[in-house]
Each structure stands twice: as structure tokens, then as C-alpha cells.
Amino acid sequence: MANLHQRQIIDKIQHITFKDGTFLNEVISDIIIKGNNIGFSIDISGKNKLEAEEIRLKAINKLNEISEVNKITIVFTESKPMEKKVQKPKHFVENVKKIILVASGKGGVGKSTISALIAQQLSLANYRVGIVDADIYGPSIPHIFGINEVPQTKDGRIIPVLAQSIEIISIGFFVKDHSAIIWRGPMASKTIYQLLSVTKWDNLDYLIIDMPPGTGDIHLSILENYHLDGVIIVTTPQKISEIDVIRSIDLYQKLNLPILGIIENMSYMLKNNSGGHLSQKYNIPLIAQMPITPQIAEACDKSLPLTNLLTLPLEKYLQ
């Protein structure tokens, strides 16, 4: 009989929600596994007691679907106003082996282009790949892949759009062309959770997350709530780009996410070697320096595969 592990528990209950929109996974802690017996606590501070009991029964029913489970113990806790919050367990994304972020502190450096290139190249190498466009306020992935359709849903799950053999999800699929998304941080963070965890991924080897610029709420939400395998940093030769990228590097180092490497985009136009300088200063591998060419811009505008123009030495950095 196989041993139980925490991921099985999280996967089974991750879609259970309270009426206020709180996901059960956001308020559980102290997961204990002893043989075939499992238990954990639910923080029901501010929740209706009857609803909490309904949620508990739903969780028990879902967990009983795991054949190895014998006994389930779920207890309720309530935090005192000044009580330090117990660190939440990080979520695994169902049916995804590895999650790689593509990030930069600076906007307009080509994160979406590089996210697309990485995904396309991995797909050509026979990996199963998906992309989450996490740039809520400026989604570019639908344009790069030429997608103009709204994803279907099945059994309450979002079915990602398939383009160039890559599974793709973006907030851009759900808004009208050129419409501004005017959301505060908590709403944007909740949307990211839904794009990651409510989407029905099909046994992916890699999920690439195209991050927004900056180091704000969305970054913290993803970093604090998900098991991640690393981040690729994108920069350009300009000094102002380097300044913002340093802030991004600082964020990922403080939160202990492995920085897999740096890609310098729009290279060779200026003498400043931002990617090489950052690589040496922070002891981070320089994966590649990508030239700025009209062909790359044209490929993005016409939704053509970027792998016809470029190849990155990815595999030794993503293992």
C-alpha cells in the first residue's frame, strides 16, 4: 500500500471554498500524516460555524476518495486578534511537475516574448508545457500566440487553450480588446490563484509563469502560496533596467527561490553589458544574450514560432 503524502491531501481539497471566496487550502495548517491516518486544522476565524461544519464534511468526503486513507481528523481553530498567523502550507498545482517563473523588475524588457520562446522550445523537445500569463494588467501572451477565443469550462474547471501544442491561460482571454483591468491587489492575487489552481492542466512537465513587472502583490501571492522550482530573470542592456532587476533579484533571494539564470534581451545595441554584470555580481548564470531584431518583433506580431529564429541553452538550467 502506497504511503500518503501532503500533496495528495492538498490536491483533493484545493477547490473547496467558503461562501466569501476563501479557498480551504488558504486556512488549513498543521497537516499530520501517521500511517493511513490524516489530520489538520482549519482556521475558521470570522467564519459561520454551520458553514464551517459543511466545509469540514466536504473535505472528509473528498479525502475519503483516496483509497489509502483510514481515519480523518479535522479540527477547528480560531486566531486571537494579536496571534501570529501560522504559516500556510504551500500549494502544488495539480498535474504540474515543475513551475518556472520568468520575471524582471522592469516592464517592457521582453518577459512575454522570452516566456513564449522557452515554452515553444521545451515543447519542441517533447516536454508537455503550459503558460500562465500572470501580467494581469497588461497580458501579452494571447497576442503572441494569436489566440482570440474564450476558454471552455468543464465540471467547474477552466480548460486551457491549446496553441502550438502549449496549454495557455491568460486573463486576456476574458476581457474585451484593449479594456483596462482596474483591480486592487487582493482581487488580482485571487485571480492568479484561480488561473493556476482552477485550470485543468493535462500532466505538464513544465508550467511557465509570465510574471508582471515589479515586486508587488501578485509576486508575493505566488511566492508565498506555491511550490516553485525557480525563476529566470530578464534584463536589457540599459542601466535603468539593471536597477529595477536588482530589486527583483533581491526579492527572490530573500524568499529563497532559486534563480536559474539571467537572459539579456535586446543585446548588442549598447555598450553596457547588464546581463554579464549582474551575472558576475550575483553569481547567477548568464543563459543567453538575445539580439534585438525586426524578425523577432514580426514573429510576435504575426504569432509565428520564435524557435525559427532563436534557440536558448535551456536544459542544463532547468533540470
UniProtKB/Swiss-Prot annotation:
Positions with a binding annotation for ATP: G105, K106, G107, G108, V109, G110, K111, S112
Keyword Cell cycle annotated: no
Keywords: ATP-binding, Hydrolase, Iron, Iron-sulfur, Metal-binding, Nucleotide-binding
Pfam families according to UniProt: ParA
SUPFAM superfamilies: P-loop containing nucleoside triphosphate hydrolases (SSF52540)
GO biological process: iron-sulfur cluster assembly
One Gene Ontology molecular-function label: ATP binding
Subunit structure: Homodimer.
Entry's family note: Belongs to the Mrp/NBP35 ATP-binding proteins family.
Reported function: Binds and transfers iron-sulfur (Fe-S) clusters to target apoproteins. Can hydrolyze ATP.
Record protein name field: Iron-sulfur cluster carrier protein
Lineage of origin: Bacteria, Pseudomonadati, Pseudomonadota, Alphaproteobacteria, Rickettsiales
Gene encoding the protein: mrp
